[in-house]
């Protein structure tokens, strides 16, 4: 069994794979203060609650944008699963040419997403990942990573609005019934949802102009389904794209 771990700035997503099948997945808070023992005990408990045997784990693959947690997760893997983890980074076989000025600068999650998306759809595409930061990554029809864009995530945008506009109430991020809000809550929701959809559609349209072809636009991340339901450019949603990419990279680096 493969334990795939996607470490983001806010949340960490874990997946348990048997072959190509995702048996179970979990989302936990990314903690800089949690020790490797605490991570190990937590992950083993998650397995047990799901009816899975932690002893069945024979490999661990990690994508992380939080470098300080590398040692913690390595020790957790060694001590609690008796395996050396694969960290996505320089030297890992991706099967994809990285056409970036400095390939080492590309975040592990962005490479993993690009690999997974091209493996599944086999066409030129843009991957939009709604995380703490929202990332846009372009892949050529030949399967080359071309680069992309990074912008503040939805949660960051919301926090900035409420922090600097003290009279505005905090609202739930959900699609309002109309673009023209009839009350303060609906007006804020309209600005957040449709404003962010405008950002997504606008960046994807400009990228498509530069690419010179009509890319498939794939969304992943916690709010991907909501945005895709309103977006004019997002055509596919894959909640587990990053985990699937980790599984692919594990297979390519055995």
UniProtKB/Swiss-Prot annotation:
Cofactor: binding details: A monovalent cation. Ammonium or potassium.
Entry-linked Pfam families: Pan_kinase
Catalysed reactions listed for this entry: (R)-pantothenate + ATP = (R)-4'-phosphopantothenate + ADP + H(+)
Major enzyme class: transferase
Subcellular location: Cytoplasm
Pathway annotation: Cofactor biosynthesis; coenzyme A biosynthesis; CoA from (R)-pantothenate: step 1/5
Binding positions for K(+) per the UniProt entry: 129
A single MF term (Gene Ontology): ATP binding
Keywords, ordered alphabetically: ATP-binding, Coenzyme A biosynthesis, Cytoplasm, Kinase, Metal-binding, Nucleotide-binding, Potassium, Transferase
Gene3D superfamilies documented for this protein: 3.30.420.40
Active site positions: 109 (proton acceptor)
Listed EC numbers: 2.7.1.33
Coiled coil: none
Database matches in SUPFAM superfamilies: Actin-like ATPase domain
GO cellular component: cytoplasm
UniProt cofactor(s): NH4(+); K(+)
Function: Catalyzes the phosphorylation of pantothenate (Pan), the first step in CoA biosynthesis.
Family: Belongs to the type III pantothenate kinase family.
Name of protein: Type III pantothenate kinase
Organism in which the protein naturally occurs: Anaeromyxobacter sp. (strain Fw109-5)
